Amino acid sequence: MENKMFCYQCQETAGCSGCTKFGVCGKSPDLARMQDLLIYTTKGLSEVTTRLREEGKEVSKDVNHLITINLFTTITNANFDDEVFYQRVKETLATKEDLLAKLANKENLSEAALWNAVSNEEMDVKVNLLSKIKDAILGSGKEESNIDKILDEKSTKVGVLATKDEDIRSLRELIIYGLKGMSAYMKHANALGYDSEDINAFMQATLAKTLDDNLSIDELIALTLETGKVGVDGMALLDSANTGTYGHPEITKVNIGVRNNPGILVSGHDLKDLELLLKQ
């Protein structure tokens, strides 16, 4: 029977081999496919930003942060809102089309970099693509519905299993999961005003390389190791952000007894959110 979805990015995946009907985490097949599409479109955008950098053109912080948040949004249990993923895919496509217009060399770009969610019929009548996708993002009725149908169809073709060679597939996904972890460090560092163009550029160039069918297994292994190395740089950036903003942790005595006062249970490690909560 054909899989309704395929996801094996967490340690709790069904049968230790992959969720194919429904996510153990609670993720639906529709949501899993839309996450696949978000990763696919983010790879395409990253290929364009990498090419822009090669041409000596600047990539804005807004674009860097869009890519970071796209990756972060797909990590296990981060977000289960279908509509969020539709909107992020549309925003990513709109951003990519805007940047493609600034790109001098469009030779040999991948299908992911060029795909735009507009049908051939609409292209034939010279639809204003950027306007159309932005209209869809804003929710203009019929246009939004048509775009969503195209996204749904595309999402069934770009998942993990689209790479047929198991070894290549596994290495690509290992790299992508490393980049997702890196995006978490970057997202939290960005929230405190810290950033790194070098890490952003690496993440995007590496995403683009997962589209390259010419890379060998040895080259992908080397890229996996490099991803781990840059991941340590991401951890260092986050540590600098945390300690630079809040100081270094100190051994502190706290009351662990029970009182009648209301309390707030905090889970996670977004210190900026915790700071804002404590200030309320």
Sequence positions of predicted segments:
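Metallocofactor- and cofactor-centric catalytic cores in central/energy metabolism, strongly enriched
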Residues: E2-Q280
